[in-house]
């Protein structure tokens, strides 16, 4: 029990006034004081669910399915000597540590047949990346996903999680999400707006989440949310799908925000009922068809999810194209890109998918739909950095290895557990297999740890310094 969880009386009175009649305040308080169950989501860009379960169950991992996400599991481990975030499987991007309720919005987005997996999608408030990587996995790295984050301090962790999970179809931006309705009207096939909120549903992982809670602050946040939702609606194509979600409980930030959009544009869209989204979803369904997940219903965080479909265009008084600086990349000429791609295929048996662009001594792989937003939006990062060039050639990057290394049919070395430990500690290794030449993908149990280079019978370690770990990562 978290007996120190801060639940102020004025907050509890507020909740009691909106709690559905069939739910108990005593159970609500008790659930808020219980530790949150640990949950993870398998990253199917790297491994199938069946293969992940087969790999981890012999290590004493008990995986109980999350009913609303077919790649999500509640987790308990027999051996917790290695912190979950420091396991080799996590660092290789095989799974993402994600609260179970937060898997719901993306499930709702992709449960709609109108959501194009190869289309142009927007995650309007993306960091730290749990839902962004979930979307990218369901897109199978096809199309393009714009991942926007307003907080500059959270961009680095978003980028790191995208690289770790092998995501290649994302362009990262750093704006107040209200600009999308202004700059990119009717551009996106599907949008997730997991809006900034008061976080009332997150007390089980942060006992001080409500330390500064007040009705006044909720009203201020709700006004911001209304502006974000209206802008996202303008950025959505007719026929497109939008999911609005929060990790809070108050009606002002949830139902009332949805109602504000209905009041303005109700004839142009409709909300879907999510009562059949998963077995037992009706337990959290509101009369409007939204999901209002109270923490005691599914023993999870509190969450809210609503899904709408846009039927018609609406007048957009927001439209105002953004001012962009000079784009620092140039398309790589075919005489340079084609030989490079042939060399990569010859060496590793895999062909990077996308368009090659160059900047200074860098070669980048951009998503295939990038041209649809080129010149309309300033990006902090697009796709993945494929290689760094020098006088005598180029050097493939660690992030390329994480994205494509598992699919390589040659040009890789498989390490045993002892050598894998050494490699993740930043040390060179002497594999048992016959030595090769040049760059080599380093794998353990079929999954990529990083890049190395053959020097005689030794593989020289090329792990980025920030990924070197002094402790054992293998159970």
Curated annotation (Swiss-Prot):
Molecular function per GO: RNA binding; rRNA (cytosine-C5-)-methyltransferase activity
EC number: 2.1.1.178
Sections of the chain in a coiled coil: none
Family annotation (InterPro entries): Methyltr_RsmF_N (IPR031341), MeTrfase_RsmB-F_NOP2_cat (IPR049560), MeTrfase_RsmB-F_NOP2_dom (IPR001678), Nol1_Nop2_Fmu_2 (IPR027391), Nop2p (IPR011023), RCMT (IPR023267), rRNA_ssu_MeTfrase_F (IPR023545), RsmB/NOL1/NOP2-like_CS (IPR018314)
GO biological process, one term: rRNA base methylation
Compartments, record wording: Cytoplasm
Residue numbers binding S-adenosyl-L-methionine: 125-131, 149, 176, 194
Cysteine disulfide links: none
Recorded family membership: Belongs to the class I-like SAM-binding methyltransferase superfamily. RsmB/NOP family.
GO terms for cellular component: cytoplasm
Protein name: Ribosomal RNA small subunit methyltransferase F
Keywords: Cytoplasm, Methyltransferase, RNA-binding, rRNA processing, S-adenosyl-L-methionine, Transferase
The keyword Transferase is assigned to this record: yes
Source organism phylogeny: Bacteria, Pseudomonadati, Pseudomonadota, Gammaproteobacteria, Aeromonadales
Gene name linked to the record: rsmF
A Pfam cross-reference name: Methyltr_RsmB-F
Species per Swiss-Prot/TrEMBL record: Aeromonas hydrophila subsp. hydrophila (strain ATCC 7966 / DSM 30187 / BCRC 13018 / CCUG 14551 / JCM 1027 / KCTC 2358 / NCIMB 9240 / NCTC 8049)
PROSITE patterns in the cross-refs: NOL1_NOP2_SUN, SAM_MT_RSMB_NOP
Reactions catalysed, as given in the entry: cytidine(1407) in 16S rRNA + S-adenosyl-L-methionine = 5-methylcytidine(1407) in 16S rRNA + S-adenosyl-L-homocysteine + H(+)
Residues of the active site: 247
UniProt keyword Ligase present: no
Function: Specifically methylates the cytosine at position 1407 (m5C1407) of 16S rRNA.
């Amino acid at each position: 029990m978290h007996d120190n969880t801060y639940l102020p009386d004025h907050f509890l009175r507020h909740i009691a006034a909106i709690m559905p009649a069939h739910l108990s305040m005593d159970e609500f308080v008790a659930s808020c004081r219980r530790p949150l169950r640990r949950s993870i989501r398998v990253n199917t860009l790297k491994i199938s669910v069946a293969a992940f379960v087969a790999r981890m169950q012999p290590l004493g991992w008990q995986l109980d399915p999350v009913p609303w996400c077919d790649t999500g599991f509640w987790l308990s481990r027999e051996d917790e000597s290695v912190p979950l975030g420091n396991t080799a499987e996590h660092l290789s991007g095989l799974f993402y540590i994600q609260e179970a309720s937060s898997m719901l919005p993306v499930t709702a987005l992709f449960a709609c047949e109108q959501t194009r997996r190869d289309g142009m999608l927007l995650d309007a408030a993306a960091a730290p990346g749990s839902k962004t990587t979930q979307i990218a996995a369901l897109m199978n790295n096809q199309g393009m996903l714009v991942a926007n984050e307003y907080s500059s301090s959270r961009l680095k962790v978003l980028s790191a999680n995208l690289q770790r999970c092998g995501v290649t179809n994302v362009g990262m931006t750093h704006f107040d999400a209200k600009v999308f309705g202004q700059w990119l009207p009717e551009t996106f096939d599907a949008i997730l707006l997991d809006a900034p909120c008061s976080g009332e549903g997150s007390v089980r992982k942060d006992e001080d989440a409500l330390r500064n809670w007040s009705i006044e602050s909720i009203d201020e946040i709700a006004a911001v949310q209304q502006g974000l939702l209206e802008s996202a609606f303008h950025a959505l194509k007719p026929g497109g799908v939008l999911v609005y979600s929060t990790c809070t409980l108050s009606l002002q930030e949830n139902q009332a925000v949805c109602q504000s959009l209905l009041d303005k544009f109700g004839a142009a869209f409709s909300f879907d009922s999510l009562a059949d989204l998963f077995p037992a979803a009706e337990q959290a369904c509101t009369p409007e068809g939204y999901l209002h997940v109270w923490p005691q219903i599914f023993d999870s965080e509190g969450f809210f999810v609503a899904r709408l479909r846009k039927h018609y265009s609406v007048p957009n008084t927001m439209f105002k194209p953004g001012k962009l600086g000079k784009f620092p990349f140039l398309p790589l000429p075919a005489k340079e890109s084609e030989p490079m791609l042939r060399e990569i295929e010859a060496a590793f048996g895999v062909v990077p998918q996308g368009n090659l662009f160059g900047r200074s001594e860098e070669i980048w792989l951009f998503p295939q739909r990038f041209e649809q937003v080129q010149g309309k939006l300033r990006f902090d990062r697009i796709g993945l950095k494929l290689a760094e060039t020098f006088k005598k050639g180029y050097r493939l990057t660690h992030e390329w290895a994480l994205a494509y290394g598992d699919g390589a049919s040659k040009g890789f070395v498989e390490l045993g557990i002892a050598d894998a430990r050494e490699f993740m500690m930043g040390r060179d290794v002497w594999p048992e297999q016959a030595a090769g030449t040049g760059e080599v993908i380093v794998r353990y149990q079929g999954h990529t740890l990083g890049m190395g280079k053959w020097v005689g019978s030794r593989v020289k370690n090329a792990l980025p310094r920030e990924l070197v770990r002094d402790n054992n990562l293998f159970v």
